[in-house]
Amino acid sequence: MIIKVCGMREPQNIREVAALAINWIGFIFYERSKRFVERCPTEQQATDSEQLSPKKVGVFVNATIESMMEKASTYKLDYLQLHGNESPEDCHTLQKRGYSLIKAFPIATKEDFEKTREYEGRVDYFLFDTRCEGYGGSGKRFDWSILTGYKGETPFLLSGGIRPENAEAIRNFRHPRFAGIDLNSGFEIEPGLKDIDKLKNFIQQILHPAVETGRAPSPTV
């Protein structure tokens, strides 16, 4: 399972989060976001010259192709997450230039999955977030049961209002294209600053529940 922690900003907090068992770390380059990072901390600043092991994701909303490419080059981003109204053609343009892409979709009903069809083959992952007035960051969770309506081939990440108390629901969630989770506001002390203990305990619960509860793992058949 991919674990992505998004909305990072402070170098020390980035170091602490990167030391956890996470796979991706996200930086938001959308100026209207409460977690907007004007200048992404460089790898050296964030990790005291040690390599930042999680993959770096740049989050953009309706940015130009040129500005995304510039940020990707400057900060050595591994993925570009497109969270606005970017077209399949925009994605294909970036894809042809060698960029790995995540396309976010606001979800409220099964009908919302229709729009993912034209992005098949144009991105590496979808990210399903709670539909709201803005571009994510609502802190609200949508009804995961409607994900049975997603029949696409592209793997997806779950986002939107995931909190520490959702660990069991995530452990029990099943879908053939489920690839991981995106964590943000549910684990914050304030916008852009993550609670390390909450993250650590949550990750322990979803990855190693038997260890966390002190129970022996169930035998496999």
Curated annotation (Swiss-Prot):
Transmembrane segments: none annotated. Pathway: Amino-acid biosynthesis; L-tryptophan biosynthesis; L-tryptophan from chorismate: step 3/5. CDD domains: PRAI. Signal peptide: none annotated. The keyword Amino-acid biosynthesis applies. It catalyses: N-(5-phospho-beta-D-ribosyl)anthranilate = 1-(2-carboxyphenylamino)-1-deoxy-D-ribulose 5-phosphate. InterPro entries: Aldolase_TIM, PRAI_dom, RibuloseP-bd_barrel, TrpF_fam. Its EC number is 5.3.1.24. SUPFAM superfamilies: Ribulose-phoshate binding barrel (SSF51366). One of its GO terms (molecular function) is phosphoribosylanthranilate isomerase activity. It comes from the Bacteria. Keywords: Amino-acid biosynthesis, Aromatic amino acid biosynthesis, Isomerase, Tryptophan biosynthesis. One of its GO terms (biological process) is L-tryptophan biosynthetic process. Belongs to the TrpF family. PANTHER family: N-(5'-PHOSPHORIBOSYL)ANTHRANILATE ISOMERASE. This is N-(5'-phosphoribosyl)anthranilate isomerase. It comes from Parabacteroides distasonis (strain ATCC 8503 / DSM 20701 / CIP 104284 / JCM 5825 / NCTC 11152). The gene is trpF.
